[in-house]
Amino acid sequence: MQLHDFGFINYAVLFGYLAAMLLVGVYFSKRQKTADDYFRGGGRVPGWAAGVSVFATTLSSITFMSIPAKAYTSDWTFIIGQYLAIAILPLVFYFYIPFFRKLKITSAYEYLEARFDVRSRLFASLSFMLFHIGRVAIITYLTVLALRPFMGIDPVVLIVLISLLCIIYTWMGGIEGVIWTDVIQGLLLSGGAVLIFIMICFKVDGGISEIFTTTAQADKFFPTTQWRWSWTDSTIPVLMIGFLFANIQQFTASQDVVQRYIVTDSIKETKRTLITNAKLVAIIPIFFFAIGSALFVYYQQNPSLLPAGFNTGGILPLFIVTEMPIGIAGLIIAAIFAAAQSSISSSLNSISSCFNSDIYTRLSKSSPSPEQKMKVAKLVIIVAGIFSSLAAIWLVLSDEAEIWDAFNSLIGLMGGPMTGLFMLGIFVKRANAGSAVVGIIVSIIAVLAARYGSDLNFFFYGVIGSMSVVIAGTITAPLFAPAKQLSLDDSETSEN
């Protein structure tokens, strides 16, 4: 097997896609008159488009490459996480969306001040912003890491290219530009996954039936050994618990997803957002896992095509640039770029919305004008993008190891307390501002103890972080002043 040059045609396809994304940003820049337009889309976004955007946002380029690699090297057990995202929809429909819609928020964390006080709001917002600056850096870093052996471009140049493009069209187009580029990117990465699987099927002797027969014989779907309980390994019971809390965090306490609930003009359209996302989640991830199984069978039949000592984390890009036709390979690499950019642009816009609402507007002595809000919003996107890019470059130059485990630990440390605060506020009526602060402190201590003082699997960190807030906040509530009267009954709205 010989790696061939990426080639002019593939580069032309890739840069054609990148230029198209810029044009989308230019188009929607004309609609960004106010901060409401910039962060809420003026309520003009249809539910189905917001749903595709949620799907594209949560399916990063790392998912695009790591899921096939996971199925190639081990099994399909991680698909459980996709279906738990669907299972929590009733919870989101009936308990969370009414609060977010009634308060007419820009930032999800405005709810926490309405329910508790400004301390909870600032903690959650700052945690989100810091986490997503790190997330953007890691997504960029891991994408470049996977692509650089095949594209012949310096990794620092790749980082600058990805980051600069995302900053520009996010800066210009606001949330509308982000969502509509997400729609294009979501369709591209979904279509890319289906196309890759079909093409591998044609290359495998015996086709699709041989792929699934061999995968089953190798016990690479849901191995019986994975059904056991473990405190340290990512077995199926652990994945079910861990992904349940990870999805609750993503869909109830993360600004990049919650922001999609408020860009539509009604609760009906917001629910359509989540239903559209659920339909995509039910179908598309199957193709990513099937790609991994198909590659496993293909390289079993053609072992000479796999370089000795090859890092199987890049198994999908390897197949794309060595086995797929010229032009098609460029399109699929564009899909990987699309998966990265959809997550990055969403993070940048949501960081900006949090800073603008929770820090700048909330802490200003006088109410900022719409023009001032817009200037700050665009400046924050640039600054957050630069910091994320510099962090990604540092990761490349320092050749950091264990970055994925550290990333998942960070999710538990920062995402767990945020999720717990929303759960405490919505489900524990007697919880108050003081008990919420106690819950945050206990949660941080508990997650740090689990991370550095035990061998617990990192999937437990989010569970510990969330439940520590709820338990400590409930127990200590009688020690503080009565809670603000903001309940589910108060959230009733006349929206259709």
From Swiss-Prot:
PROSITE patterns: NA_SOLUT_SYMP_3 (PS50283). N-acetyl-alpha-neuraminate binds at T58, S60, T63, Q82, R135. It is found in: Cell inner membrane. Changing S346A: Slightly increases Neu5Ac transport. The keyword Cell membrane applies. Keywords: Cell inner membrane, Cell membrane, Ion transport, Membrane, Sodium, Sodium transport, Sugar transport, Symport, Transmembrane, Transmembrane helix, Transport. Changing D182A: Abolishes Neu5Ac transport. It holds the Pfam family SSF. Residues 1-7, 60-76, 145-154, 200-235, 293-325, 397-403, 454-457 are periplasmic. Both Na(+) sites regulate Neu5Ac transport. The binding energy of the second Na(+) ion may be used to allosterically stabilize the substrate without directly coordinating it. In the absence of external Na(+), the rate is reduced by 78%. One of its GO terms (cellular component) is plasma membrane. It is a multi-pass membrane protein. One of its GO terms (molecular function) is symporter activity. InterPro entries: Na/Glc_symporter_sf (IPR038377), Na/solute_symporter (IPR001734), Sodium:Solute_Symporter_SSF (IPR051163). Sialic acid plays a critical role for growth and colonization of several pathogenic bacteria, and inhibition of its uptake represents a promising strategy for the development of novel antibacterial drugs. Potential sialic acid uptake inhibitors include sialic acid 4-N-piperazine and piperidine derivatives. The chain crosses the membrane at residues 8-29, 47-59, 77-92, 117-144, 155-172, 175-199, 236-252, 273-292, 326-356, 375-396, 404-427, 433-453, 458-479. One of its GO terms (biological process) is sodium ion transport. CDD domains: SLC5sbd_NIS-like_u3 (cd11495). The keyword Transmembrane applies. Its main location: membrane. Symporter that uses the Na(+) gradient as the driving force for the uptake of the sialic acid N-acetylneuraminic acid (Neu5Ac). It allows the use of host-derived Neu5Ac as an energy source by P.mirabilis. Also binds N-glycolylneuraminic acid (Neu5Gc) and ketodeoxynonulosonic acid (KDN). Shows the highest affinity for Neu5Ac and Neu5Gc, which commonly occupy the terminal non-reducing position of mammalian cell surface glycoconjugates. Adopts the LeuT fold and is in an outward-open conformation in the crystals. One Na(+) ion binds to the Na2 site, which is conserved in the SSF family, while the second Na(+) ion binds to a new position, termed Na3. Belongs to the sodium:solute symporter (SSF) (TC 2.A.21) family. Rescues growth on Neu5Ac as the sole carbon source of an E.coli strain that lacks the endogenous NanT sialic acid transporter. This is Sodium/sialic acid symporter SiaT. It comes from Proteus mirabilis (strain HI4320).
